[in-house]
Amino acid sequence: MELWDAYDRELNKLGGVTLVRGEEVPDGMYHLVSEVIVKHTDGEFLLMQRAPTKHFGAMWEATAGGSALCGESPLDCARRELLEETGLSGEFTRIGTVVHDGHRSIYAEFLCVTDHDKNSVRLQTGETAASKWVGFEKLKSMEAELASVRCLHSYYEYGESNGNNQI
């Protein structure tokens, strides 16, 4: 059984409340999800193909990520999820926060810059089926093919706010 902390809309932890994966999140409460875009120091981005058995199966995604466990910070969750799904680590920068009322989720968005060998990506059984590295223009051109673009849009906004649309 996976347990989550409960948060209000402003990402304040609600003490004394524990959420359980698979159970409905009560009105006015949210659970935390961290998503990570991975950029290699050579400028390419990691894409992963979702396992065919998952929701949006066989689609490509530009993020690793998942729900934060009880007691986990957004950054700790991002690091754990990236390591579990890819075997990679690197330097993390928080690039955004997205509240999704329909999912009762708060998405903490991160950019991870890594210098790991690009051939060392380790796929997580049951989660991912393939991976590939693509340049910025290719990433932008694939938006319609991606399972989710939420974190990608946070990345674009982060780049624009820092005067660089290709950070």
Give the ranges of each region predicted by the language model:
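A short, polar/proline- and glycine-enriched secondary-structure boundary/capping micro-motif
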Residues: 25-27, 56-61, 132
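A glycine-rich, hydrophobic loop/mini-helix early in the fold
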Residues: 33-64
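Short, solvent-exposed loop/turn elements at beta->coil junctions and helix N-caps
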Residues: 21-24, 95-100
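The catalytic Nudix box helix
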Residues: 46-47, 62-95
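Acidic, metal-coordinating catalytic segment for phosphate/diphosphate chemistry
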Residues: 1-35, 41
